[in-house]
């Protein structure tokens, strides 16, 4: 956003403040947690203010997402666990959202199934490519689900707490 339109990313905080298309973005996830490779949301931690800001705009939706489970294998167990829990909660919040639909529910259900069946295995052995792939795909399904159904109180409460304590 700032590469094309300048300024500080804080100027684009909120919904629909990006003035137009950005430079085409190719997203390559290195964790299985945020789902940002398939969403129009970007959450950025401002460490100087102990604050997480959210930019929401369809203009920042990645043009392509390249999924390579090998890239997840170097994450420490603590990061793999935190990201996996985040992805599962993305799916859970989308599933119970009042804005949920049959489509978002299908994405959320598949995400919860993939993550639920693989998170312990992946955290225990990040070199397990099959588990890493399931976590990665589950995270992206969760991202699609919450893009359509939105998130809830868990994420609303977690952003200020996690920014203040500098935890994922």
Question: Model features per residue range: what roles?
Answer:
Residues 160-168:
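Catalytic phosphate/nucleotide-handling subdomain of diverse soluble enzymes
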Residues 41-149:
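Carboxylate- and glycine-rich phosphate/diphosphate-binding segment that chelates Mg2+/Mn2+
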Residues 1-69:
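Glycine/threonine-rich beta-strand-loop-alpha-helix active-site module
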Residues 2-4, 94, 164:
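Active-site catalytic microenvironments for nucleophilic, acid-base chemistry
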Residues 155:
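Short conserved active-site loop signatures built around small residues
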Residues 152:
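Charged, alpha-helix-enriched surfaces in structured cytosolic catalytic cores
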């Amino acid at each position: 956003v700032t590469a094309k339109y300048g300024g500080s990313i804080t100027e684009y905080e909120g919904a629909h403040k990006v003035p137009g298309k950005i430079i085409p973005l190719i997203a390559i996830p290195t964790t299985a947690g945020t789902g940002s490779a398939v969403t129009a949301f970007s959450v950025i931690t401002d460490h100087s203010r102990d604050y997480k800001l959210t930019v929401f705009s369809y203009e920042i939706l990645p043009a392509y997402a390249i999924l390579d489970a090998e890239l997840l294998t170097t994450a420490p167990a603590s990061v793999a666990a935190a990201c996996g829990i985040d992805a599962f909660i993305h799916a859970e919040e989308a599933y119970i959202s009042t804005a949920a639909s049959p489509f978002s529910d299908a994405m959320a259900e598949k995400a919860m199934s993939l993550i639920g069946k693989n998170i312990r295995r992946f955290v225990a052995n990040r070199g397990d490519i099959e588990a890493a792939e399931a976590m990665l795909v589950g995270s992206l399904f969760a991202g699609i689900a919450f893009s359509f159904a939105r998130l809830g109180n868990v994420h609303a409460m977690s952003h200020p707490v996690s920014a203040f304590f500098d935890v994922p």
